[in-house]
Regions:
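N-terminal cap/recognition module
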Residues: 4-107
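Generic detection of short hydrophobic beta-strand segments and adjacent strand-loop junctions
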Residues: 4-8, 208-215, 279-284, 415
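Short amphipathic alpha-helical segments
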Residues: 17, 21, 133, 137-144, ...
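Stable alpha-helical structural segments in soluble proteins, enriched in small hydrophobic residues
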Residues: 32, 140-152, 453-463
Length: 486
């Protein structure tokens, strides 16, 4: 899949359409959530103990199911009548395959409302939010709510079996507090059209088309869907196409491997087993961007809340929205530049697989100093890994993510053991080398190496999908090349 993003401001002719649909999507999702939660709590109580809202919701649900079942019976009988009047072998076959579909009423033990039940209840009862929304956009909002609940049920079952995987017990899906939620159009309600060498989207019930740019950009792709999400005072239109590309699979016997260590001072550190010098991409632009963002945001919030209670005052402004948009776009730009440099380097050196180090929940309870903590947790490393995966799929280079605990502390040259952090019964490991200053690691024999390159080498070693014996013989990973991307 490939997604194009477009920012839409208040000057756009479709601003009202996007405002209405994102606000209604939020209402629809909250309404579906409200029905599910009240049916859950209401059926667990006796009729005398139920609250007014629980009684009202249960009445709406039972009435809606009754009406939907009655309509289903009428449609079934009408279809049978038409088929019998038509006669013939084909009608007889269709008639034998025709089935009456009816909804079951929720019970104390089986209380969950599926998408089909919610959609039928809102449709036959004429719910105002459901009826005023664009076709299929309302149904997609219900689907997202039901999907959130199913994910919750799955997480609860997994939590019961493996509580150590979670920070806390999963909670039931909550209500959306923002003014809007992501609205989702299918390729039937937001249709793609080409005219005069350009591509346009035509939304249902809207006369004004939305221009996507040159038609040549989308040649050979299959249009899938369009999503519109609130984005710091603007709207971001995400148009998804099927480019028929899948992530490349790891070869059975890879020979050339590239280890990547993601960090802060050095955003990327890469080292391979094929003799080329390792390189590091400086993280200065990312740190400077975050520092500027935090400083400017503090100034704007201070001016906005001056003379009022900071906890309960209004903290939204056009300047804050513009600042957040600028920071997000700049961060995305830096990450994609890093990803493209890394993947072009990999293609140039015929790399068989890229191994990226990561730590699960690495930002939880981190303690690397007050200033480093602030800088580290502000960088969306998950987004950087996703950018690398996206570019790798385009260039068909396999990418593997490897758990990297202790890779920065262990000595690559001394073959130190690197267990998984947090394992039960783990004895704290002792390492042969140590970091003697910022960015420099010294092994047992006194040999010095760039600390981040040592981490990248250990990530390759921990992945253990190819032999690194040649690196120990050659010793050509001492001095990395520094790359500046801004």
């Amino acid at each position: 899949m490939r997604t194009w993003g477009f920012n839409v401001n208040k000057n756009s002719a479709l601003w009202k359409c996007f405002s209405r649909n994102t606000a209604d999507t939020r209402c629809m999702r909250n309404t579906a959530n409200f029905y599910i939660r009240n049916v859950m709590t209401g059926l667990r109580k006796s009729p005398e103990e139920r609250t007014h809202t629980e009684t009202e919701v249960l009445h709406e649900v039972f009435t809606g199911i009754q009406k939907a079942n009655t309509l289903a019976v009428e449609r079934y009988r009408e279809n049978l009548r038409k088929l019998r009047l038509a006669g013939g072998m084909k009608s007889a076959v269709v008639c034998s395959c025709l089935k009456l579909k009816q909804f079951s009423y929720p019970t104390r033990t089986n209380w969950f409302l599926s998408y089909e039940v919610l959609d039928a209840v809102f449709k036959v009862t004429g719910h105002p939010v459901y009826c005023r929304m664009d076709s299929q956009v309302n149904q997609n909002a219900i689907r997202k709510t039901v999907k959130a609940w199913k994910s919750y049920f799955k997480a609860v079952r997994d939590y019961a079996a493996h509580p150590e995987k979670y920070q806390a017990k999963p909670r039931i899906p909550g209500y959306i507090r923002t003014t809007g939620a992501t609205a989702w159009w299918t390729n039937q309600t937001a249709k793609l059209r080409f005219r005069d060498g350009k591509a346009y989207l035509r939304f249902v019930n809207e006369k004004q088309p939305f221009c996507l740019g040159k038609a040549s950009l989308f040649e050979g792709f299959t249009y899938v869907k369009t999503e519109v999400q609130p984005f710091h005072g603007h709207f971001r239109v995400l148009v998804t196409f099927d480019d028929r590309l899948k992530e490349a699979s790891v070869p059975e016997h890879p020979e050339r491997i590239l280890g990547v260590d993601i960090g802060l001072t050095n955003l990327l550190s890469a080292a391979g087993n094929f003799g080329d010098a390792p390189f590091v991409v400086g993280g200065g632009p990312v740190k400077a961007l975050n520092q500027w963002f935090n400083k400017r945001k503090a100034e704007l919030l201070s001016a906005l809340t001056r003379g009022s209670d900071s906890k309960h005052s209004h903290k939204e402004s056009h300047a804050l929205d513009a600042l957040s948009r600028k920071r997000d776009d700049a961060m995305t730009d830096i990450f994609y530049k890093c990803a493209w440099y890394l993947l072009r380097y990999a293609k140039k050196n015929q790399v068989d697989v890229i191994v990226i180090g990561y730590n699960k929940a690495q930002k939880q309870d981190i303690s690397i100093g007050k200033q480093n903590n602030q800088a580290f947790v502000s960088v969306p490393y998950g987004k950087l890994r996703q950018c690398i995966r996206t570019v790798a799929a385009k260039l068909q280079v396999p990418v593997v993510e490897q758990e990297e605990s202790y890779t920065s502390m262990a000595s690559f040259w001394d073959l130190d053991e690197m267990p998984v952090y947090g394992e039960a019964g783990l004895v704290p490991p002792v390492f042969s080398g140590r970091r003697i200053c910022r960015g420099l690691y010294q092994d047992r024999s006194g040999r010095r190496i760039n600390a981040d390159v040592n981490g990248a080498l250990n990530i390759m070693r921990k992945c253990n999908i190819v032999s690194l014996r040649a690196l120990y013989d050659r010793g050509d990973v001492d001095t990395p090349v520094r790359i500046r991307i801004a």
